[in-house]
């Protein structure tokens, strides 16, 4: 998250997405929670928040894309970004940087969201794809999708259709190793793993690939006001903010 490398932002998947989904607002009784992870969560949070606003037609107050940490077998808390005291370091607890999003439980919506996710991968050579922030290495940056039911989910076919680069979808067991250079994306059961919101100062942050507009950064205050973001994660100050 602290290193910089330049790649083009994921705009094509948004512009190529289907017309705005019907019933894209939040709060439906059947909404599902999906986690997307690949590299630093700043890029994935931006991609998915823009997907919510542009494709689902959600207002700023309805955005649900929250940055955080998930996928670890260790249930300890708090779960935090790297800090001087070494308190609750997410990667040491087996977690990866991830984004949680609430979606209507339709195959079309999940496929659209997953297509945005898969569009973020870049060619590494030898028909292998990986995260764009190639200097961020280690299990804390591994790629996974977590949805209800995991590989047994009836919606998994939507994820497979969105898999633009033909990457291998494999079962994750929690606290999994890095996926960089393997052309793999783990699939987890989101109901089996807790999502830990990242520190507020890391939410809706500029990415290492460039800056985002003020209208995007303002989402932090909007989600704090509607309590979708909580101010106290129990984490100390970190090496970013």
Regions found by a protein language model. Name each.
Residues 14-241:
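Flexible coil/turn and secondary-structure edge motifs
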Residues 1-13:
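Cleavable N-terminal signal peptides of Sec/SRP-targeted secreted and luminal proteins
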């Amino acid at each position: 998250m602290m290193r910089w490398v330049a790649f083009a932002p994921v705009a094509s998947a948004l512009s190529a997405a289907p017309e705005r989904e019907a019933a894209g607002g939040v709060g439906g009784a059947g909404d599902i929670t999906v986690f997307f992870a690949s590299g630093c969560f700043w890029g994935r949070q931006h991609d998915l928040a823009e997907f919510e606003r542009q494709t689902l037609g959600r207002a700023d107050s309805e955005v649900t894309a929250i940055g955080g940490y998930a996928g670890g077998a260790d249930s300890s808390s708090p779960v935090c970004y790297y800090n001087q005291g070494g308190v609750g370091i997410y990667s040491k607890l087996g977690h990866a940087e991830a984004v949680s999003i609430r979606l209507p439980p339709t195959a079309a919506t999940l496929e659209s969201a997953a297509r945005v996710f898969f569009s973020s991968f870049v060619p590494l050579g030898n028909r292998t794809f990986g995260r764009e922030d190639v200097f961020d290495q280690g299990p804390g940056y591994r790629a996974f999708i977590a949805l209800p039911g995991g590989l047994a989910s009836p919606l998994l076919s939507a994820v497979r259709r969105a898999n633009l680069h033909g990457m291998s979808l494999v079962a994750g067991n929690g606290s999994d190793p890095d996926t960089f250079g393997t052309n793999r994306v783990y699939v987890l059961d989101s109901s089996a793993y807790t999502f830990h919101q990242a520190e507020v100062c890391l939410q809706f942050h500029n990415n290492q690939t460039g800056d985002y507009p003020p209208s995007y950064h303002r989402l932090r205050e909007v989600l704090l006001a509607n309590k979708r973001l909580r101010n106290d994660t129990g984490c100390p100050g970190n090496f970013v903010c």
